[in-house]
From Swiss-Prot:
It comes from the Bacteria. Keywords: Antiport, Cell inner membrane, Cell membrane, Ion transport, Membrane, Plasmid, Sodium, Sodium transport, Transmembrane, Transmembrane helix, Transport. NCBIfam families: NhaA (TIGR00773), PRK09560.1 (NF007111), PRK09561.1 (NF007112). Na(+)/H(+) antiporter that extrudes sodium in exchange for external protons. GO terms for cellular component: plasma membrane. It is found in: Cell inner membrane. One of its GO terms (molecular function) is sodium:proton antiporter activity. Belongs to the NhaA Na(+)/H(+) (TC 2.A.33) antiporter family. The chain crosses the membrane at residues 42-62, 69-89, 110-130, 140-160, 169-189, 192-212, 215-235, 238-258, 277-297, 312-332, 346-366, 380-400. It catalyses: Na(+)(in) + 2 H(+)(out) = Na(+)(out) + 2 H(+)(in). It is a multi-pass membrane protein. This is Na(+)/H(+) antiporter NhaA.
């Protein structure tokens, strides 16, 4: 039996809208379905990248990634340009959920928000504790603080109706808040030397985007043109270029035009981008960044401070932080347990939050831009911690009895 959104009381009431409009839970269901299948795609390309990086084709793989195209390497185009589109989608999702979705009220934000906070703080503390004797390594403190929603929902999708829908919504909301935290971390802690002129031009472009929103411009084309201009100025300013995607997302109108199309510009852009990001951009990023050669590496390499701190932070830190903070919030009656979910369900999802992959790899690149060795060690830690979290989280949820009624 396939669980349907809106089937259970905790998922909220179905809303009847004008003909042709998207129902909120249709949007969420579509999002979850695509993210789940995208997670499986991401697993495949990550495994393929590892295989190529440790095969006779490794020189070709690395040569293509470091080939210069229009002044940047292919890897830089992927990490700076394609990932800006990924962050644009992240920004759109954050804005929609905060204004008109699962995070629209403080009561809905409480449990995923508190759990997300724990899931960022505890892994960072573990990483710092492991790497305290190596000051140069401490720039990577935020690496294990991220959750990869595509991977996590991909694992949940393998469990079918054994997992309550409310728990999938909880994980989605937590991951969105986690992404918001990652965006703030990148903006505050991983900014290079700034170029004042480019910052001024970027700010002027932002004002232009704000003016379009303020005057009710609904066509997407003007926003996208200014978004490309903003990306260029941000790229040259010293701030990481991907943040231009988030800034552009905040300017896209959420309200539909009166007498116009049935959906808002934000919804149109989100649904247009979703398949491209899920099945092209994120897999390309994973393929380009997951490949690490194990040649010359022994088991002792896993005990180096960076991979050990990342792996322990993702696997132990995430589950302790997410589950511990969620338990405290429920015990203090600040938040409620997701409907039809048990403590075992919640713990299993907390373990799955240790799948860091996309955002963890991305932060690792920002943390150690000049050290290929530390970047490779980061990849090893991310792959190890994420794999353990995925396998153990799946096993916990697989053996946990479904706590909600079967309905047809």
């Amino acid at each position: 039996m396939r669980v349907r959104f809106g089937q259970y009381p905790n998922c909220g009431k179905r809303m009847v809208l004008e003909p042709g409009r998207l129902r909120p839970y249709s949007i969420l269901r579509s999002f979850l379905d695509s993210e789940a299948s995208a997670g499986l795609t991401l697993m495949f390309v990550a495994a393929l990248a590892l295989l190529l990086a440790n095969s006779p084709f490794a020189p070709v793989y690395f040569d293509v990634l470091h080939r210069q195209v229009l002044g940047l390497t292919v890897l830089h185009w992927i990490n700076d340009a394609l990932m800006a589109v990924f962050f644009l989608l992240v920004g759109l999702e954050i804005k929609r959920e905060f204004l008109d979705g699962q995070l629209a009220t403080w009561s809905r934000r409480a449990l995923p928000g508190i759990a997300a906070l724990g899931g960022m703080v505890v892994p960072a503390v573990i990483f710092i504790a492991v790497n305290g004797g190596e000051p140069a390594n401490l720039r990577g403190w935020a690496i294990p603080s991220a959750t990869d929603i595509a991977f996590a929902l991909g694992v949940l999708s393998l469990l079918g109706p054994r997992v309550p829908v409310s728990l999938k919504i909880f994980l989605t909301a937590l991951a969105i808040l986690d992404d918001l935290g990652a965006v703030l971390i990148i903006a505050l802690f991983y900014t290079a030397e700034l170029t004042p002129l480019m910052l001024i031009l970027a700010a002027a472009t932002l004002l232009g985007l704000a003016a379009l929103n303020r005057f009710g411009v609904k066509p997407l084309a003007p926003y996208l043109v200014l978004g490309v201009v903003l990306w260029f100025f941000v790229l040259q300013s010293g701030i990481h270029a991907t943040l231009a995607g988030v800034a552009l997302a905040l300017a896209i109108p959420l309200q539909a035009s009166t007498g116009g199309g049935p959906t808002s510009p934000l919804h149109r852009l989100e649904h247009a981008l979703n398949p491209w990001v899920a099945f092209l951009i994120v897999p390309v990023f994973g393929f380009a960044n997951a490949g690490v050669s194990f040649a010359g590496l022994g088991l002792s390499a896993l005990l180096d401070p960076v991979p050990l701190g990342v792996a322990l932070g993702l696997f132990f830190g995430k589950q302790v932080g997410v589950f511990g903070f969620a338990w405290l919030a429920i015990w203090l009656k600040i938040a409620d347990m997701p409907r039809y979910a048990s403590w075992a369900h919640l713990y299993g999802v907390a373990v799955l939050c240790g799948i860091g992959f996309t955002m963890s790899l991305f932060i690792g690149l920002l943390a150690y831009p000049e050290s290929a060795v530390l970047q490779d060690e980061t990849k090893i830690g991310v792959l190890l911690g994420s794999t353990l979290a995925g396998l153990i989280g799946w096993l916990i949820l697989r053996v946990t009895k479904a706590g909600f009624p079967e309905r047809t």
